């Protein structure tokens, strides 16, 4: 019963109950849920929006658990991947206050898969992208593709633009040799976005593995707005 109570109290960011349970049974600090996540992973995953509490409630819980001696880099499972607490803060709670707290306490952004950038990009969380990059996550880390190209293909354009402005390689080619512009023309993304990308360094003349450039691909479309966007 105590194990269930402490898991629920941490997930609900109930610091009063969590403190009381740990004071009574310090060994509960080692509890993990069925997915192999410890109390710190659960605290970092708690959605303040869902719980309708301030982001600072999560920071207080995380700080409390760290002060009790929990390892800031201990890994828990996200799917099949072992991930540190900062990943859960980026991918699950999406809480920049917790991300900043962890970084201030010494968490390594680079310990998260993809430096946390793919998770932040998937959600379009620009503030978390900024925190992670400032903390040392390599902007062009490759996990199949780069965070920029992934964000672009996911149509998370605020994230993709942010990464481009921070210096991401906008001409990165995937395994088929395709750049963001190739994908943009193929998917008929808003021509204004294609124009923006060209203005920020994307080349419409890079050929893919089939020797087709974005400009050539656009020239074959009936809708000539896509070709004009690459001028």
Residue ranges of predicted features:
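Ankyrin repeat domain, specifically the short helix-to-loop turn at the C-terminus of the second helix
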Residues: 22-27, 60-71, 100-108, 130-138, ...
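Ankyrin-repeat-protein effector appendages
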Residues: 1-5, 135, 166, 193-195, ...
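Ankyrin-repeat boundary/"N-cap" motif
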Residues: 2-6, 31-49, 75-88, 110-119, ...
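Ankyrin repeat A-helix N-terminal signature
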Residues: 8-13, 42-58, 88-95, 119-125, ...
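Eukaryotic tandem repeat interaction scaffolds
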Residues: 115-175
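N-terminal alpha-helical scaffold/docking segments in eukaryotic complex subunits
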Residues: 7-11, 21-24
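A generic tandem-repeat structural signature
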Residues: 58-108, 114-116
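Alpha-solenoid repeat scaffolds
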Residues: 28, 46, 50, 72, ...
């Amino acid at each position: 019963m105590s194990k269930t109570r402490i898991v629920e109290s941490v997930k609900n960011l109930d610091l009063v109950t969590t403190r009381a349970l740990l004071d009574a049974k310090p060994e509960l600090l080692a509890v993990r849920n069925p997915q192999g996540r410890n109390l710190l992973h659960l605290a970092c995953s708690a959605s303040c929006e869902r719980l309708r509490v301030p982001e600072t409630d999560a920071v207080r819980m995380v700080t409390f658990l760290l002060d009790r001696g929990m390892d800031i880099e201990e890994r828990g499972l996200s799917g099949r991947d072992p991930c540190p607490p900062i990943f859960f803060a980026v991918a699950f709670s999406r809480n920049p206050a917790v991300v900043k707290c962890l970084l201030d306490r010494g968490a390594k952004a680079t310990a998260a898969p993809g430096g946390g950038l793919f998770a932040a990009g998937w959600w379009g969380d620009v503030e978390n992208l900024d925190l992670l990059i400032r903390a040392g996550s390599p902007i062009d880390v490759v996990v199949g593709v780069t965070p920029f190209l992934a964000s672009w293909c996911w149509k998370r354009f605020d994230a993709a633009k942010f990464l481009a402005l921070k210096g991401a390689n906008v001409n990165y080619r995937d395994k088929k040799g395709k750049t963001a512009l190739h994908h943009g023309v193929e998917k008929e993304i808003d021509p204004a976005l294609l124009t923006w990308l060209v203005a920020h360094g994307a080349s419409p003349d890079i050929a893919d593995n089939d020797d087709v450039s974005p400009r050539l691909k656009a020239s074959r479309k009936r809708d000539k707005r896509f070709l004009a966007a690459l001028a």
